[in-house]
Amino acid sequence: DRYYVKQGNTTEQYIAENSIVKVYGSEAAEQVIDNCFQIFGGYGFIEEYPMAQAYRDNRINKIWEGTNEINRMLCGRAMITKALSGEIGFKEYLEKVDTYCRDNLDSGYEGEFKSEVECIEAAKAVYAICLNESLSRHGQDIGTEQMIIENLANILIFSYVADSTLSRVMQNKDLYSRKNQIVPELCAKVYTAEQGIRVMEHANKILNSIYDGEIPSELNDKLNFL
């Protein structure tokens, strides 16, 4: 009995991370299989070729264990709960973001992955700003604003995946030969560059929804600085 209680508590504690991994993993697999399917062309539909079954079998991954839409709601609402309860130091972090933007501070990071680190940290800051504005506008009713929750979740997913990927690349720097580091490093850089651009798209959808297309100039200045 104690085992199941502990298991339930642990699952609850990491519900946001669990949802992120489920969504990203299933959608990344879908993208890979779809690209492979495209290579086969019309033959991809023929059962004698490998992609037909892979394409069919993978489709269920976005449905079971909670559809990806539901998991986006779960991770979005979980982070809101953590922010409101003070568990993650949301107010303190938001104050740091305000100071960073107001005083035009530099990240202070120096290294090979400076651009990637700054992109990821900017995404986290954008998430905090958008979450704060959403809470200010909708209060306790934020949980019913599915479009806002979905876009907040998309920013969160990028931040989590990019941060985890880059952290692993940097940790492994002294463990493997340079030859074995090249591909993981390029993957981290490409993912951060390609998906980082979309963070502002998600942010604009959230803020335009809140302010009916008239985002305050002060808020725009913050986003432009980041």
Name each model-derived stretch:
Residues D1-L226:
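Alpha-helical interface subdomain recognition
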